[in-house]
């Protein structure tokens, strides 16, 4: 079984090319493969397939709204084996892999997800590096919320970016204090407000067009980056300045991305790196199915 390994601003993924969607992916297998000691190690798995194949194989019960049968489909699984609606960094890496592998030759195409279609523009791609913009769709503010992160109680704004986020901006937080915060520790939030869990971002106030962010992703813990989280952070940061639209650089531990919030949509531009490819032992893979 072949695989590729890549990352978008150090949010890393194992890609499993499975265009016909024939591969069985149990939660136990996903968790084992993502384990950094007994598997390959990753924040998540990206199955590379098409929307119609995913429906035919029962991976999807039906096409997500706006996704066409012939679209590529990113079947994204969190490191704990759960299924996730969307991952902005994952879409960039997914699109890069399609180009680098020769499965796709266009500069502009659509990647389907549980959250709907995500049009991509590949500005540059070679076998290792790519620069990709993802149309993330409209990010919707849902109201205020609170979280406790690293023992610090924070107020935030709930944002729907195809998956749930709570972006917590602390105007008194410096980049140095943010770097020292224990974002990897379990976070507390209102489960009545977020019954399926939530991704929690902690961010500084914007300065000179830059906002610094760290994220605790549901089902994963702290990651070096979160694409949908950077969009949520940009929405919250702009709102703190009394703006509904604008462009910000979001600085995460894994690097910088550019987020453009418009009246109609949100655009995420950033890098992708393909690190390795190889084969997974079929015997090992079978042993992980439980």
Curated annotation (Swiss-Prot):
Active-site feature positions: 87, 226
Gene Ontology BP, a term: lysine biosynthetic process via diaminopimelate
Q: Which UniProt keywords apply?
A: Amino-acid biosynthesis, Cytoplasm, Isomerase, Lysine biosynthesis
UniProt-annotated site: Could be important to modulate the pK values of the two catalytic cysteine residues, residues: 165, 217
Per UniProt, where does substrate bind?
A: 11, 78, 88-89, 163, 199, 217-218, 227-228
Localisation per UniProt entry: Cytoplasm
Q: Quote a single Gene Ontology cellular component term.
A: cytosol
Task: State the family it belongs to.
Answer: Belongs to the diaminopimelate epimerase family.
Record field: catalytic activity: (2S,6S)-2,6-diaminopimelate = meso-2,6-diaminopimelate
Pathway where this protein functions: Amino-acid biosynthesis; L-lysine biosynthesis via DAP pathway; DL-2,6-diaminopimelate from LL-2,6-diaminopimelate: step 1/1
Q: Which domain of life is it from?
A: Bacteria
Could you tell me what this protein does?
A: Catalyzes the stereoinversion of LL-2,6-diaminopimelate (L,L-DAP) to meso-diaminopimelate (meso-DAP), a precursor of L-lysine and an essential component of the bacterial peptidoglycan.
Q: How does it assemble?
A: Homodimer.
Residues folding into a coiled coil are none
The protein's name is Diaminopimelate epimerase
Q: Which GO terms describe its molecular function?
A: diaminopimelate epimerase activity
The question of whether Isomerase is a record keyword is answered with: yes
**Which Enzyme Commission numbers does its entry carry?**
5.1.1.7
Q: Which gene encodes it?
A: dapF
